[in-house]
């Protein structure tokens, strides 16, 4: 509750959280908040300018850009949420087991992580695309295969730190069950760390799925996706540059929102890292080490 209170006191964090909630709402309620079919082709109305009928105009096939922009939230953001959730779940389970029990279990899980982290995520993604073809599903699978190992390593380090604390040692001494110790004494302490690395990972995952779609290796046409929309706009960027603005700005805004949220979470958990707090302390004549 203290962390949440600090987070809500940060105006930047509140704005970032509001933007993320708005994006998620628009993505889930896309059929309810739009008036057009995102894939409806109207060549007689292509490259239409901004108007009351089309607030952001139309593309080279006469499709409403705003409608496609909203529908693109689903593969660009909501699919990434699913991949992130599965990656964090797998990484957390293995990270807790590795960091708490250590020994043979730790060595076995860490060697598996070494194998997975030996291959760059882009290489794994390209390999899956070569084997199974293009599609968001293969990119999401690649995210899960590469990200779980990274989450596992980070969470393992955090768990090992808390496992060595006095209250956990005391719980072991009195014979408390291992699973109960993890659930009651370690898991609540690591949730904040998991939230920070999850929010920061969202940025790179959104950029990656948009990047692959921009290269024509991600979401298949005619499905609306920000990277795909940028790819389509690239072909007419000199004659109709406005087509690139909407998906580009949408990506920039959501990535900045997750970056701000990640920074705010770190400050909420440990206020000492805030330069503003340090400046106030110096002004008061208090030197913090």
From Swiss-Prot:
Top-level taxon: Bacteria
Please give the start and end residues of each transmembrane region: 13-33, 77-97, 115-135, 194-214, 249-269
Q: What effect does gene inactivation have here?
A: Deletion of the cntABCDF genes decreases StP intracellular levels and decreases the import of iron, zinc, nickel and cobalt.
Coiled-coil features, chain-numbered ranges: none
Membrane topology category: Multi-pass membrane protein
Broad class of where this protein is predominantly found: membrane
- Keyword Membrane attributed: yes
Q: Which GO terms describe its cellular component?
A: plasma membrane
Q: Give each disulfide bond as a residue pair.
A: none
> What does its record list under induction?
Up-regulated in metal-poor media.
| ABC transmembrane type-1 domain span | 73-262
According to its UniProt record, where is this protein located?
Cell membrane
Extract the InterPro entries matched here. BP-dependent_transpt_permease, MetI-like, MetI-like_sf, OppC_N, Staphylopine_ABC_permease
User: Sorted alphabetically, which Gene3D superfamilies does this protein's record hold?
Assistant: MetI-like
Pfam families annotated for this entry? Answer: BPD_transp_1, OppC_N
Q: Name one GO biological process term.
A: cobalt ion transport
Q: Which UniProt keywords apply?
A: Cell membrane, Cobalt, Cobalt transport, Copper, Copper transport, Ion transport, Iron, Iron transport, Membrane, Nickel, Nickel transport, Transmembrane, Transmembrane helix, Transport, Zinc, Zinc transport
Quaternary structure and partners: The complex is composed of two ATP-binding proteins (CntD and CntF), two transmembrane proteins (CntB and CntC) and a solute-binding protein (CntA).
Say what the protein does.
Part of the ABC transporter complex CntABCDF (Opp1) involved in the uptake of metal in complex with the metallophore staphylopine (StP). May be involved in the import of a large array of divalent metals ions such as nickel, cobalt, zinc, copper and iron. Probably responsible for the translocation of the substrate across the membrane.
Q: Which family is this protein grouped under?
A: Belongs to the binding-protein-dependent transport system permease family.
Q: What is this protein called?
A: Metal-staphylopine import system permease protein CntC
């Amino acid at each position: 509750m203290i962390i949440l209170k600090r987070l809500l006191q940060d105006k930047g964090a509140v704005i970032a959280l509001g933007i993320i909630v708005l994006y998620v709402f628009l993505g889930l309620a896309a059929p309810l908040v739009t008036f057009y079919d995102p894939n409806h082709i109207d060549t007689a109305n292509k490259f239409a300018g901004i108007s009351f009928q089309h607030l952001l105009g139309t593309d080279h096939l006469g499709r409403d850009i705003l409608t496609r922009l909203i529908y693109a939230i689903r593969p660009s953001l909501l699919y990434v949420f699913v991949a992130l959730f599965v990656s964090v779940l797998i990484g957390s389970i293995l990270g807790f087991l590795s960091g708490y029990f250590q020994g043979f279990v730790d060595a076995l899980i860490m060697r598996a992580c070494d194998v997975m982290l030996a291959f760059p995520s882009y290489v794994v993604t390209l390999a899956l695309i070569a084997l199974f073809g293009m599609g968001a599903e293969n990119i999401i699978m690649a995210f899960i295969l590469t990200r779980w190992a990274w989450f596992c390593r980070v969470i393992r380090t955090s768990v090992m730190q808390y496992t060595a604390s006095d209250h956990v040692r005391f719980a072991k001494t009195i014979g408390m069950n291992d699973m109960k110790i993890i659930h009651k004494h370690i898991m609540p302490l690591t949730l904040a760390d998991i939230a920070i690395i999850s929010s920061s990972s969202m940025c790179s995952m959104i950029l990656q799925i948009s990047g692959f779609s921009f290269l024509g290796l991600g979401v298949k046409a005619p499905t609306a996706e920000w990277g795909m929309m940028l790819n389509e706009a690239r072909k007419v960027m000199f004659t109709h540059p406005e087509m690139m603005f909407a998906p580009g700005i949408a990506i920039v805004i959501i990535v900045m929102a997750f970056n701000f949220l990640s920074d705010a979470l770190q400050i909420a958990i440990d206020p000492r890292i805030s330069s503003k707090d340090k400046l106030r302390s110096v002004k008061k004549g208090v030197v913090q080490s």
